[in-house]
Regions:
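Conserved "repeat-terminator" motif of extracellular CCP/Sushi domains
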Residues: 2-8, 90
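Surface-exposed recognition segments
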Residues: 150-151, 155-156, 184-185, 202-285
């Protein structure tokens, strides 16, 4: 649950020294080579929620609970990519932040990005460094914080297979420890070991939607167009275009829960599969 608090972090620039939101963890930016990139990418400072979005806070914001596996502290699931964007905007408005997404034409499958100073740009041109509200992470950002970021680099643990460990059972709910049993379901967040940044459930429990749009080439392989920090295909006006998901879920095997595994799903269709899909919010600071 998000509650307004004041917490200071050392090493942050003057004028940007306070965090107003409980359970939002400061993640220092840096440079690294993502698993899918041929070169280093830069990540700027962000705040990341400790947990996937829970049903409790979703219900408070959206006034409904679509989840198949009910429980206040379980991740919300059965949520589409577009619904996750809507949640981010409503949460931003609740706390007086400028929403990131222009969703007035979302029913047509059209998305625009709202940068600061009332600048509205197409998704492939967006610079999230110039946004204020809550949003989905890019895949570059997701791999950075799931791997432990700069802290893990300094500790020599950045290359863990899973988020926080090479032992999946320490950090993840997945097929072997929950998914293969008759009562298989999501689990309450925060019950497994956190990663180096204090983030929970990046591996397993629910897949996490990322911002990035995915297209396939003629061979059925992922087709990405490089654009600064983002890996964004420019077919942003297609509502059913595939979007990136990361981290695996309660119903997946260990390979799917690895940090560097790349999953995807359609933005609005195949609703029956959405019980595997949740999301985690981030915010530029």
């Amino acid at each position: 649950e998000l509650k307004v608090i004041i917490k200071k972090y050392s090493g942050r620039k003057a004028g940007n020294t306070e965090s107003k939101f409980q359970n939002m963890v400061f993640v220092q930016g840096g440079k690294y080579q993502p698993s899918f990139a041929d070169e280093e990418k830069e990540v700027f400072n962000i705040e990341v929620c400790k947990y996937p979005t829970t049903q409790k806070i979703w219900l408070e914001v959206m006034e409904n609970n679509p989840s198949g596996f009910k429980g206040d502290n379980r991740p919300v699931e059965t949520v589409s990519w577009w619904e996750a964007l809507d949640y981010c905007n409503r949460l931003s408005e609740k706390y007086g932040l400028e929403p990131v997404y222009e969703l007035s034409k979302s029913s047509e499958g059209t998305l625009m990005i709202k940068e600061l100073r009332e600048k509205i740009v197409s998704p492939d041109k967006a610079n999230f460094k110039n946004t204020e509200g809550f949003r989905l992470p890019t895949e570059v950002e997701w791999e950075w914080f799931a791997s432990g970021g700069q802290k893990a680099i300094e500790q020599g643990t950045f290359n863990y297979i899973y988020s926080g460990s090479n032992n999946i059972d320490e950090v993840a709910w997945y097929y072997e420890n929950i998914g293969k049993f008759d009562d298989a379901s999501t689990q309450e967040v925060g019950l497994k070991k956190s990663n180096q940044l204090g983030l929970y459930d990046c591996s397993g429990n629910v897949w996490e939607w990322c911002y990035d749009t995915i297209e396939f080439d003629e061979n059925g392989d992922y087709k990405n167009i490089k654009n600064g920090n983002l890996y964004m295909y420019e077919a942003f006006d297609l509502s059913n275009t595939y979007r990136r998901v990361k981290g695996g879920s309660w119903g997946n095997g260990n390979k799917d829960c690895a940090i560097f595994h790349r999953g995807c799903n359609q933005a609005i269709n195949v609703k029956e599969y959405f019980r595997y899909f949740g999301f985690r919010i981030v915010r530029t600071i």
